[in-house]
Amino acid sequence: MKTKSYKDLEIYNLSFKLAQEIHELSLKFPKFEMYEEGSQIRRSSKSIPSCIAEGWGRRYYKNEFIKFLIYALASCDETKVHLDFIAGCHYITEEQHQHYIERYNVLGMKINKYMQYVMKSYLSPKDKQETDPGIVENPEHYSIEDE
């Protein structure tokens, strides 16, 4: 199946679902943590699908696409650090901690694999021009005539 949108990407769907779960989980933290650790883990978890979507929007520039996948991977690691903090403060059980750490480990591996795929085989439109010109714009359409 051809990927038509970032919403077709497994890494986007998995990260979005995890971010929703983390959001719900964080609402059960003590009130004084709602704007501290609760806010931090919500932002880092939501950053992952956001970076994947933004990278997809820049997919015509391979290096930009990869950069945003790297940001998503970094946010995945950041979320795991926040999970360690909240487990250490006993806001979640050890079982919950292990459950989410394992799922974020899997997500990180999937993001890394997708990033490797993009690096090795993904051709931006600029790279494709030699074999498939696609839409070719005429620069004359952008010239300004003197009045």
Residue map of PLM features:
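Amphipathic alpha-helical assembly/interaction segments
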Residues: 1-147
